[in-house]
């Protein structure tokens, strides 16, 4: 199973059940015939931006963040260190080796405002539909850094 399919399965499980630990999530994935290492699961959870909430009985469980003022997930924002814009293009700077991870996160969300991404080692080019969208996304990212 590829990464995108696996992460979509994780989202499906998190949305349908109260999962309180990584071990519970790993078990639910195995019931779905998806086998992952603890390291892979941990990385997927970080990239998806999962966070813990408490229900009325005080039980902690994982949730998927809802996008607020930006289309980018908390996981994507985690990787962005600097942002620059020119016309309809955004340039995101990341730590070395993280630009491709950020590209995968952005591409997997399939936002209509973004035409595509091109990743280097620590730089990501984001091609937006137009200059207005690029400007708005730049502002959103800057306000969330």
From Swiss-Prot:
One of its GO terms (cellular component) is cytoplasm. InterPro entries: Arg_repress, Arg_repress_C, Arg_repress_C_sf, Arg_repress_DNA-bd, WH-like_DNA-bd_sf, WH_DNA-bd_sf. It comes from the Bacteria. GO terms for molecular function: arginine binding; DNA binding; DNA-binding transcription factor activity. It is found in: Cytoplasm. Signal peptide: none annotated. Pfam families: Arg_repressor, Arg_repressor_C. Regulates arginine biosynthesis genes. PANTHER family: ARGININE REPRESSOR. HAMAP family: Arg_repressor. This is Arginine repressor. The gene is argR.
């Amino acid at each position: 199973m590829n990464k995108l399919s696996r992460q979509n399965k994780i989202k499906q499980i998190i949305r349908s059940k109260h999962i309180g630990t990584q071990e519970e999530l790993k078990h639910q994935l195995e019931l779905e015939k998806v086998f992952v290492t603890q390291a892979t699961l941990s990385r997927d959870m970080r990239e998806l931006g999962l966070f813990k909430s408490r229900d009325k009985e005080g039980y902690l469980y994982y949730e998927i963040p809802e996008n607020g003022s930006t289309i980018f997930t908390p996981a994507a924002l985690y990787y962005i260190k600097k942002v620059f814009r020119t016309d309809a293009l955004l340039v995101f700077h990341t730590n070395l080796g993280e630009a491709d991870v950020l590209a995968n996160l952005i591409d997997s969300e399939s936002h209509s405002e973004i035409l595509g991404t091109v990743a280097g080692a620590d730089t990501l080019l984001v091609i937006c539909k137009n200059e207005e969208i690029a400007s708005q996304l730049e502002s959103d990212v800057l306000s969330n850094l």
